[in-house]
C-alpha cells in the first residue's frame, strides 16, 4: 500500500465528474487499499478517488466505531453510489482533505438510503443517518465535481475565499 497525494482546492481536477467503475479488478483493489492508507494517514473519515486524481466513482468512508476508532472493520468501500431516498435536514461542521484546515457548517439531508457496489461488484443498499449520512453526501459530491464549500451561503463563501487566499499566502512564505 502507498500513501497517495491528495489534490487540493483550487485544483481543477476536483471539478471533474467521475466516471462509473466498470471493472472490479486488482487495479481497483490496489487503488482502494492505497486510498485507505492515504485517508487514515491524513486523519480523514472519507476520501473520494477524484481527491487522489483518479476520476472514477469510488469512495471510502470510515467514521469509526462507537469510540471513533477506525479500522478495516468499520471501513465502507463505495463504488458507483446512487441515492435512493433522502429526507430531513441537519447542519453539521464539515472539513475536507482537499480543503485542508478549513471547517464550516453545512446543511445536508439527515437520512439517506444509498445503493452501491463493493470492491468485488456485490450490490449493497445502506440506510445512513447523522455523520454517516453526511459522509455519503460529502464524498459523493466529490464524484460530481463539487466541494463542501460550494454549499456555503454567499457570505460564508466569500469569507472562505478570503481566508483561503490568506492561508495560501502564508504557506508560500514558508
UniProtKB/Swiss-Prot annotation:
- InterPro entries to which the protein is assigned, alphabetical: Peptide_deformylase, Peptide_deformylase_sf
Q: What is its EC number?
A: 3.5.1.88
Sorted alphabetically, which Gene3D superfamilies does this protein's record hold?
Peptide deformylase
Q: Name one GO molecular function term.
A: peptide deformylase activity
**Annotated GO biological process:** co-translational protein modification; translation
Q: Which residues form the active site?
A: 139
The annotation note on the cofactor reads: Binds 1 Fe(2+) ion.
Q: Which enzyme class?
A: hydrolase
What domain of life?
Bacteria
Q: Which UniProt keywords apply?
A: Hydrolase, Iron, Metal-binding, Protein biosynthesis
Name the chemical reaction catalysed here.
N-terminal N-formyl-L-methionyl-[peptide] + H2O = N-terminal L-methionyl-[peptide] + formate
Q: Which NCBIfam families does the record cross-reference, listed alphabetically?
A: pept_deformyl, PRK00150.1-3
Query: Could you identify this protein by its name?
Result: Peptide deformylase
Which organism is the protein's source? Nautilia profundicola (strain ATCC BAA-1463 / DSM 18972 / AmH)
Q: What is the lineage of its organism?
A: Bacteria, Pseudomonadati, Campylobacterota, Epsilonproteobacteria, Nautiliales
Amino acid at each position: 500500500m502507498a500513501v497517495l497525494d491528495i489534490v487540493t482546492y483550487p485544483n481543477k481536477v476536483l471539478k471533474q465528474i467521475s466516471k462509473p467503475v466498470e471493472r472490479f479488478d486488482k487495479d481497483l483493489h490496489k487503488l482502494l487499499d492505497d486510498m485507505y492508507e492515504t485517508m487514515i494517514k491524513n486523519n480523514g473519515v472519507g476520501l473520494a478517488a477524484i481527491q487522489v486524481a483518479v476520476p472514477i466513482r469510488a469512495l471510502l468512508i470510515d467514521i469509526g466505531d462507537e469510540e471513533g476508532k477506525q479500522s478495516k472493520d468499520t471501513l465502507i468501500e463505495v463504488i458507483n453510489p446512487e441515492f435512493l431516498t433522502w429526507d430531513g435536514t441537519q447542519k453539521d461542521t464539515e472539513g475536507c482533505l482537499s480543503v485542508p484546515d478549513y471547517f464550516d457548517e453545512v446543511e445536508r439531508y439527515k437520512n439517506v438510503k444509498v445503493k452501491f457496489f463493493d470492491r468485488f461488484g456485490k450490490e449493497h443498499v445502506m440506510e445512513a443517518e447523522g455523520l454517516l449520512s453526511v459522509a455519503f453526501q460529502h464524498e459523493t459530491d466529490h464524484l460530481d465535481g463539487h466541494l463542501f464549500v460550494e454549499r456555503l451561503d454567499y457570505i460564508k463563501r466569500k469569507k472562505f475565499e478570503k481566508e483561503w487566499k490568506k492561508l495560501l499566502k502564508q504557506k508560500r512564505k514558508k
